[in-house]
From Swiss-Prot:
InterPro entries: Vesivirus_VP2. Its main location: virion. Translated by a ribosomal termination-reinitiation process from the bicistronic mRNA coding for VP1 and VP2. Belongs to the vesivirus VP2 protein family. Keywords: Capsid decoration protein, Capsid protein, Host cytoplasm, Virion. GO terms for cellular component: host cell cytoplasm; viral capsid, decoration. The N-terminus domain points away from the virion surface. This is Minor capsid protein VP2. It holds the Pfam family Vesi_VP2. Minor structural protein that forms a portal-like structure at a unique three-fold axis of symmetry, following binding to the host receptor. The virion attaches to feline junctional adhesion molecule A (F11R). Once attached, the virion is endocytosed. Acidification of the endosome induces conformational change of capsid protein thereby injecting virus genomic RNA into host cytoplasm. The channel formed by VP2 may allow the delivery of the viral genome through the host endosomal membrane. It is found in: Virion; Host cytoplasm.
Amino acid sequence: MNSILGLIDTVTNTIGKAQQIELDKAALGQQRELALQRIGLDRQALNNQVEQFNKILEQRVQGPIQSVRLARAAGFRVDPYSYTNQNFYDDQLNAIRLSYKNLFKI
């Protein structure tokens, strides 16, 4: 009789442990899904920040470039090697964009 009760107890414990393992697996799966969602949201937030940064940067760059174009159109002589040179700003803009993207690459 004791051996039968012992066997039943062992089977019950084994089933309980198996159920606990399955519950743990399910919990880990949910945590993994939540972590992946969090990573996706973080990546989306970072992309939004990069876009905002680029918009602000382009506004700051395009302002002086537009001023030079207007000055030239009005007949003023503008030094092509000054800090308002189009190529200078394009190079700076591209360098900053690349460094900013590389800094936050996931």
